[in-house]
Swiss-Prot record:
The name this protein goes by in its record: Sensor histidine kinase MtrB
Domain of life: Bacteria
Enzyme class, UniProt record, top EC level: transferase
Domain (HAMP) ranges: 235-287
Gene Ontology MF terms in the entry: ATP binding; phosphorelay sensor kinase activity
Function comment: Member of the two-component regulatory system MtrA/MtrB. Seems to function as a membrane-associated protein kinase that phosphorylates MtrA in response to environmental signals.
Species in which this protein is naturally found: Mycolicibacterium paratuberculosis (strain ATCC BAA-968 / K-10)
Subcellular location: Cell membrane
Database matches in PANTHER family: HYBRID SIGNAL TRANSDUCTION HISTIDINE KINASE C (PTHR43547:SF2), TWO-COMPONENT HISTIDINE KINASE (PTHR43547)
Chain intervals with Basic and acidic residues compositional bias: 550-565
Amino acid sequence: MMWGSRRRTRSRWGRSGPMTRGMGAVSRAVGTAWRRSLQLRVVALTLGLSLAVILALGFVLTSQVTNRVLDVKVKAAIEQIERARTTVGGIVNGEEARSLDSSLQLARNTLTSKTDSASGAGTAGTFDAVLMVPGDGPRAATTAGPVDQVPASLRGFVKAGQASYQYATVHTDGFSGPALIVGSPASSQVANLELYLIFPLKNEQATIQLVRGTMITGGAVLLVLLAGIALLVSRQVVVPVRSASRIAERFAEGHLSERMPVRGEDDMARLAMSFNDMAESLSRQITQLEEFGNLQRRFTSDVSHELRTPLTTVRMAADLIYDHSADLDPTLARSTELMVNELDRFESLLNDLLEISRHDAGVAELSVEAVDLRSTVQSALSNVGHLAEDAGIELQVELPAEEVIAEVDTRRVERILRNLIANAIDHAEHKPVKIRMAADEDTVAVTVRDYGVGLRPGEEKLVFSRFWRADPSRVRRSGGTGLGLAISIEDARLHQGRLEAWGEPGVGSCFRLTLPLVRGHKVTTSPLPMKPIPQPSPSGGQSPSTGPQHAKDRARQREHAERSL
């Protein structure tokens, strides 16, 4: 039972206890506020430095006051003991018939009785007297007063014939606390007579405590005033900076008319004017760029529409000539075939330009229906399969055994897949192209993997640029226009999906399309890894990464790739 109780106690108040978690939360909150608030740092640093200065000054001033008060006390005590020596000498030397003990007691009573009078006490204040004649051989010491309160070190000086003083804590009938003890040899006929005066430091201690309390109170008030001053001063700087930050955020959101108010002619006013000048320049340039972009989009759209009419006429004439190409000279027949092929490519380019202009104008719309994406993949393969056959490239397809129903625009998704497969065929270098599909509860992914030339670092983003080509000298077998991947990524975004690329020179490349199964949902993960898992060489031989150990490595890589998503 006892061990169980200890375990429960550690569980409650240990590292994972509520107190520790609460302290951790407070620490994180303070750290966050310290990092994010310039005003907090300024006020805290001002208070810290001010506190250090006040403590240093307080220590110096307190030391000076203490030393001054004690110096005055010592000076008055020395004057008092000089007068006491004369009094003691007169009493001890007055009547020889009196015993030594009686003489010492009479002298002590005479000295202490004078302290009851303000005029007799002088500036040294009240005191108690101690008189002592050390013993000599069998004769015991003769004393008067609390001799046990006199420090032995002070007695050593007095025995040597020197006047001295020492601070000590005394405990007498009338006082208990710090005191100043002054000792001196007495001038009398009695040999080795020692005189000590004990001056309580009660009043001096009260004076010093009053000074310390006053300084502490004054320091606390000064700290509060300095905190308020630092807060007001820092606010004069922080408020315009915060205003500039808020206006910059609104400016970045598209509110191009936002400006900072200009007040006065100081540094903050110059900052506001510079910010407004910058905002005005950026607003003007952004407006110009928007106008140029709109003009470019209108030009592309208008040219595409205007070219469609003459293209239709030329197409009709070319088809008519092509239908009678058998009756023409072989040279003319070949020219007719080339003309028809180029017209097909030109018509495809116009269609792509029109599609791009729709995306740029934000008028592209989805025609969503619930379909089995496996049939969409098969349809895309049937459209570009002849390209693989002509190039002697094997298409390896892995599709799920069960239906993959998704709410998509079939035409756009098929166009994405068609572009990806055609692009892979163009860069496969006569090696197989692998198409895989996988789905989870929320998303579906299709990867198109080739083992051709691959991509250099940084080209994963460039491949989706318009008219971009990694190698301009490479011939497109698919007859593409250079806009296929640019349109594909726009179609993927229209579905709130993702289209990503990966590649390494000489290893190949992989394109992954990830779409939500339900329209309107966002893609956060993908059921297929981006970086392909090492596979056996497409040429038919075994790659170096074979064997049981490498199989385990591939499994770990697959797990790591899926977790990284």
